């Protein structure tokens, strides 16, 4: 995910997301569909009006793209991310698990 930089904000989006070759297709209720390569994505924010399938989640997680679910105000309230050993989140989990007890206590204060 070295080159991923793009945050796709669909928190107020109304429409459908579909898995597509090498990316996802964004289909607004009115307008043309847009193909977004997952290689460019770091984070995708989706709101209450977005419809997506497990295949979209699989495509994003496979590419180590974080998918955050937002409430009606656009504030993230949950998420899905890859459990890959090579991802950013997995690296952070390993680093936190390897901390000494005093450092773990300091982290939570």
Region locations from a protein language model:
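N-terminal intrinsically disordered, cationic/polar leader segments
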Residues: 1-46, 50-109
């Amino acid at each position: 995910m070295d080159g991923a930089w793009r945050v796709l904000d669909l928190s107020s989006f109304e429409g459908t997301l579909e898995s597509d070759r090498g990316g996802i297709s964004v289909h607004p209720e009115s307008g043309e569909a847009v193909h977004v390569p997952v290689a460019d994505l770091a984070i995708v924010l989706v709101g209450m009006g977005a419809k997506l399938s497990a295949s979209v989640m699989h495509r994003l997680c496979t590419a180590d793209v974080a998918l955050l679910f937002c409430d009606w105000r656009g504030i993230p309230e949950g998420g899905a991310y890859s459990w890959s050993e090579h991802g950013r989140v997995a690296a952070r989990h390993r680093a936190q698990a390897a901390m000494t007890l005093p450092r773990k206590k300091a982290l939570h204060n």
